């Protein structure tokens, strides 16, 4: 005990002398000046002698505190035969034994834990780390039942025989060494460490320690062979950074590990992993051997199956080694099957081959607490950060190796991902490439955002992510509070590039906000670029809606397009949209090209798309590439991902457009010029110059179900459309939820508010909505709102083939009008109102709904305007019919409830309207109705 106390005094003296040496010199000088009249020239020599005297006194006192073992070292060997010998060495000066050989004789097996009571620190110190040899007599082993690390400071140049530790009490200390520093060694010496769970009484018991090595200092190189008893669970805990092999690895350290064990608990405050708690820049962990770990539990702020957190670190797995591990990883900030958190900032490419980790089947979860809502959980990385510029990180596997994402989400976390919980990048020019990855998601998670590959691409992070040859199967109940994506749950701003064969399977998935087979939600800008074969036949939301979609649930301002040859297999289990607005722009190898002189071009290094813009908003469209260019600019602001020069989006929404040739945009994925969600309004002009424009919206390739504004122009105000031949087909379900947005369909304009001029337009319009909720369908305009300004139709002809194809609905929710579906109430009395002059209407208008078994049901149809609505307190609408020809128009309705009514050649119910009727000619037209009342002319009130 005295030696140990003296040892502490010695260390304190040394530290005080080192720290306050300059103060001693200053003090002595000041005293001399105050109490003597000594000449300045003599003061320097006197002070030097005084300081030397103080120094010698401190040195002598320090030397006296060590146990002298000089005479015990024989030919460089210190022999330990009993506990007293060992304690004598522990209390000796590290400078004396730094390079000696410590020989444990066979008598050391008699050590007991009680022999070392009160000893807290092992051999070596920062100034004199142990660099010698520790060995046992031949045929014997080194058994140490100690509660402290054998070495306080150990050099990686030291040679150690196999050491068997038995930790009798729970202590926040390492097993072998608190610190390992780099010595003069070319390659790592192998250190064999075993854990013996036998205490003084012979009971099977093992107490916790923080790690085998606490901290590896800069440049240290270690090769550890660790054997833990198979029948006892070892607990690694108590440190800020906890890992069985090492708590923390400083920069440029290297650790090789061979592990024989089956059961392990690792818990740390900040970082915890089976092998290492924290790895600093350029640290390397090599796993040369690892038995199957069948009962492992890891917990910390940043918890990882292998490493808690790492920066620019390298993990190598030996040839023929595949890691197999079951148990749990629970993090309050991050939880990852391999890494809780990983940051990469180097200039060269980084590759993670995850095929070696296919046996990692840890149950991943977030612990409860204040950080849960922002916590990230992933089967490989909880959080992955690319903080470099223009650097590629690759995550690759093989088709035969499956990564299992076993989520145990009893506590709601921020983000869950099949590979990465949350990813962020410093630059769009960098890349995260995932290829040849097979992911099985099992268990359940309760997350804000969930993705089959990435839960969330971080806020304000501009990231490029490529996905190739990947299969994702989400098998059990995985719910998302907000957004759910087959590849990415939530992308603040991201470019998702999909190629090769990509298959996503997830049945009846749900989220409060958005569901998509590729991306759940884009918050701001982004791009989805589709190539190869995309199979989403097994992916569908439980309750399809306008944001529960096949490809992207909420696309925000994202551009979505496909390359030539892209094949897409959709689900047949549900009728759902591809995305919440628009469709996939389908490029080809003929006229819609990914090239600078066609529609758009892709910068493969900067990861941006440039649309071939227009110099101003007086534009001529001569082919469908021109149409696509104009449409893309109307739909997208120029941003970091999608760029163009010249006319802006605002300019294009007020453009003067002319056709110089016939244009067919069918099968391009374009649904018109604009976003079909009613977000923007066209106020410009379109002169067709007697050319034909053909469009088909809602094909087998591009399903349209919940899109609200469907037409050449989604929304107009003050627009002028003239000299155009328009052939349009709208295969739209129009099944918006009850109480939600209505569906508007019109070949020219889905929804108009304000003035509108349609002159010399010939339209052949086909539409067949079948949804059970509100649809306003018109041959030219779906809905006219507040017609206080003039809405005129002149010198035009419409062939309207409109069918409400729902015989089971019990509500009369759909208006079918040959020219206008419905006119809303006005806010003030119009001067002119709605005018028809020299307009011809023909075609087939069919309402198949029969209504409820009792009550009333009306067929809201009409050859001109199906219905004019009214607010009781509003001013009347004005309709002027100067010259209208109803020619070869067949109206057929199916309502048959007592009291039901059916519209006819002109309309159904026109409320609060002043009608000026000059000339109507009806010829070759029929009305077929099973309702009790049908109206050749509308009911005008």
Give the role of each language-model region.
Residues 1-46:
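Gram-positive cell-envelope targeting signals
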